[in-house]
């Protein structure tokens, strides 16, 4: 059979049209070294900083070092089964974690996988762990309070929505307790909470989760866990994962609170990764970009304006601002706040709550040192009644500490100095508060009012706690309407002052403690 040229060309065209090839563009490389959770890869020509690299066995690594002829990557999890010669490939995406309301009440790992045995997660999508913080124009000034429930904090070191307030102190001094109580106090405020546990024992985290559940706060909280036994990469990334989960609420016009417990351990994990990647060490062997490690994380905590929220939600949410408030925790060694990481985080944040070992050991809990604790922006957000009443608390405590040190050497004190010392002693005693017992605004206002207006003068020092408990019980039963008004509005005027005074006068005349 002979074919003419036309038939041949038609046949070729037909075959070309019918030709079907499935092509997959992949950038493959080969592992040339594996050690201590770090892999070195040759042959990856097109890879991004922070990109996920797919490993054999459906595992992933993150590219951190991009060198001329190799890529240094850190493995997300166990690496014992990896070997030289294994093939890897790029994915073209950076690490993302699930976000949404379905995560509330759940315990997840750094990758957003559930580890609480409650079944699969319900989520609203995925968000990258590394996100650029909102710009200056997209932000709104801080003017709404976050009540921690602690008299010492809410009166002297107030925290606003969108603020970054550092909790700093030595180990076993009540840093986590303060943060957990702040979370418990948000269960009825509408503020969604994220608790990020980095480098802690699994038993410690289990206890925290149990306490949150007991006090009804777990349903309002996402717990992100990277235990001490997990890979350094997971400990380093856990705060960023938790931040993305908190930003979900901020960007939709809601308020959220995130606790990083603690950033010292995150910095140690990052130092470990950097040294294994052969990056040049700096002060205290930390890499040069350890400041950027924390600044890019903490800058994401912000209060954003209504225009930002409307633009993000494509017009679904209008006229609402959103906020992400951060409470980072830093552990110091023997009270040394001038070490590298503490000074970095102090300079990044909007204030710090300094917890002191000597105060803790003397029985003052929370062990807040009011002299060097400060809130740089929270004053504008403080509840009106607490702001008006607490003006003299900080100065009374500061004067008391100075005079107490002086009075140890002075045998005879004048009446004014003795009165200041006695007032300071009573205020110090009043600032004590039990764990898992956050106080409402009205209860705080009544306690501070009793100190400021001199009702504690006739109370023995060891009876201050009993006096306060009886007073609050009396006010909540006999003056319930007044307490509700204070809690609802936070206002302070002549009428409220008169009612408070009448209530305390009646209590002192008729009640015992």
From Swiss-Prot:
HAMAP family: ATP_synth_alpha_bact (MF_01346)
Family: Belongs to the ATPase alpha/beta chains family.
Enzyme's top EC category: translocase
Enzyme Commission number(s): 7.1.2.2
Reported function: Produces ATP from ADP in the presence of a proton gradient across the membrane. The alpha chain is a regulatory subunit.
Keyword annotations of the record: ATP synthesis, ATP-binding, Cell inner membrane, Cell membrane, CF(1), Hydrogen ion transport, Ion transport, Membrane, Nucleotide-binding, Translocase, Transport
Taxonomic path: Bacteria, Pseudomonadati, Pseudomonadota, Gammaproteobacteria, Alteromonadales
Catalytically driven reaction(s): ATP + H2O + 4 H(+)(in) = ADP + phosphate + 5 H(+)(out)
Site (Required for activity): 373
Gene Ontology cellular component list: plasma membrane; proton-transporting ATP synthase complex
One Gene Ontology term of the molecular function aspect: ADP binding
Assembly and interaction partners: F-type ATPases have 2 components, CF(1) - the catalytic core - and CF(0) - the membrane proton channel. CF(1) has five subunits: alpha(3), beta(3), gamma(1), delta(1), epsilon(1). CF(0) has three main subunits: a(1), b(2) and c(9-12). The alpha and beta chains form an alternating ring which encloses part of the gamma chain. CF(1) is attached to CF(0) by a central stalk formed by the gamma and epsilon chains, while a peripheral stalk is formed by the delta and b chains.
Superkingdom as given in the UniProt entry: Bacteria
Protein name: ATP synthase subunit alpha
Topology class, membrane: Peripheral membrane protein
InterPro entries in the cross-refs: ATP_synth_asu-like_sf, ATP_synth_asu_C, ATP_synth_asu_C_sf, ATP_synth_F1_a_nt-bd_dom, ATP_synth_F1_asu, ATPase_a/bsu_AS, ATPase_F1/V1/A1_a/bsu_N, ATPase_F1/V1/A1_a/bsu_N_sf
């Amino acid at each position: 059979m002979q074919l003419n040229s036309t038939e041949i060309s038609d046949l070729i065209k037909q075959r070309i049209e019918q030709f079907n090839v499935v092509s997959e563009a992949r950038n493959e490389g080969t592992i040339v070294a594996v050690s201590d959770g770090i892999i070195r890869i040759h042959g990856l020509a097109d890879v991004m900083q922070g990109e996920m690299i797919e490993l054999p066995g459906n595992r992933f690594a993150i590219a951190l070092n991009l060198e001329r002829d190799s890529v240094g990557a850190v493995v997300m999890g166990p690496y014992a089964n990896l070997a030289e010669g294994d093939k890897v490939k790029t994915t073209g995406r950076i690490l993302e974690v699930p976000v949404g309301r379905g995560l509330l009440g759940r315990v997840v790992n750094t990758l957003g996988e559930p580890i609480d045995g409650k079944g699969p997660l319900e989520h609203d999508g995925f968000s990258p762990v590394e996100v650029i913080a909102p710009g200056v124009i997209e932000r709104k000034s801080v003017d709404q309070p976050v009540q921690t429930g602690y008299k010492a904090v809410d009166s002297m070191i107030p925290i606003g929505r969108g603020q970054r307030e550092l909790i700093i102190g030595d180990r076993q001094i009540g840093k986590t307790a303060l943060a957990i109580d702040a979370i418990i106090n948000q269960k009825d405020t509408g503020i969604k909470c994220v608790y990020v546990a980095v480098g802690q024992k699994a038993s410690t985290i289990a206890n925290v989760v149990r306490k949150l559940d007991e006090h009804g706060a777990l349903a309002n909280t996402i717990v992100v866990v990277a235990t001490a036994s997990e890979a350094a990469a997971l400990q380093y990334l856990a705060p960023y994962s938790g931040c993305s989960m908190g930003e979900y609420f901020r960007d939709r016009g809601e308020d959220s609170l995130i606790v990083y417990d603690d950033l010292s351990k995150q910095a140690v994990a990052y130092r470990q990764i950097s040294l294994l990647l052969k990056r040049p060490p700096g002060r205290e062997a930390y890499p040069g970009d350890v400041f950027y490690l924390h600044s890019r994380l903490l800058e994401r905590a912000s209060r954003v304006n209504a225009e930002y929220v409307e633009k993000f939600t494509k017009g679904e949410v209008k006229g609402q601002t959103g906020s992400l408030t951060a409470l980072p925790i830093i552990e110091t060694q023997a009270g040394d706040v001038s070490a590298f990481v503490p000074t970095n985080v102090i300079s990044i944040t909007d204030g710090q709550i300094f917890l002191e070992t000597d105060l803790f050991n003397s029985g003052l809990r929370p062990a807040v040192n009011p002299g060097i604790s400060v809130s740089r922006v929270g004053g504008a957000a403080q509840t009106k009644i607490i702001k008006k009443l607490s003006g003299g608390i900080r100065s009374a405590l500061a004067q008391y500490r100075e005079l107490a040190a002086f009075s140890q050497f002075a045998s005879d004190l004048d009446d004014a100095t003795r009165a200041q010392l006695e007032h300071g002693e009573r205020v110090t005693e009043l600032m004590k508060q039990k764990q898992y017992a956050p106080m409402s605004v009205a209860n705080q206002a009544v306690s501070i009012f009793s100190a400021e207006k001199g009702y504690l003068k006739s109370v023995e020092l060891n009876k201050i706690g009993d006096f306060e408990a009886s007073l609050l019980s009396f006010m909540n039963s006999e003056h319930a309407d007044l307490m509700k008004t204070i809690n609802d509005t936070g206002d302070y005027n002549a009428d409220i002052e008169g009612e408070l005074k009448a209530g305390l006068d009646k209590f002192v005349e008729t009640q015992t403690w």
